[in-house]
């Protein structure tokens, strides 16, 4: 039908090697880098805060080096349509707040009083109390860029060429599982907290 609404073209595409490096860094970031950092920093007597900081700092540096051209291309697109991008950011933020309220209600129904104890959030809060500076740099600057390039650009961008629905589902589940899998190893019930990350991974 001529009046059927058409989605805007998807232009945020990495090159073949940019995709390989972004997705390929996932197992490095999740498993190999933490193990290497723990061995090195424990030998040096460093704290858990600096262990986490070093893992994200290495990933952040790797992503900037390997994805710089992709970031530069997309920054040009943002500048060309700044007003439209700003409207999308604000509307998405408002939608995320609404979705978060709904998710919080679902968690209360499922877990009752235990719904406030997301172990990942507790861990970040505790690290912030112990060492605010490194944790703030990690959470505000390094983690968003690193995670967006792996999950949004890498996984979503790759699958988007074949199926928009599959791209959303896989990238959302991967992003959500990424935040709770370590805690679920100790208690599988912690997998329920994946739903807290679905709104932000969708938007």
Go through each PLM region and give its residues:
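N-terminal, membrane-interfacial amphipathic/helix-forming hydrophobic leader that caps
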Residues: 1-117, 185-189, 195-198
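Short acidic/polar alpha-helix capping motifs at helix-coil junctions
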Residues: 25-27, 117-123, 170-177
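Generic structural signal of hydrophobic/aromatic residues within well-ordered alpha-helices
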Residues: 71, 106, 123-127, 137
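Hydrophobic alpha-helical segments of integral membrane proteins
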Residues: 82, 86, 106, 120-124, ...
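Alpha-helical membrane-spanning segments of integral membrane proteins, especially the hydrophobic core
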Residues: 89, 93, 125-134
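Transmembrane helix-loop-helix hairpins at the membrane interface
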Residues: 101, 130-203
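Membrane-interface interhelical connector segments
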Residues: 110-130
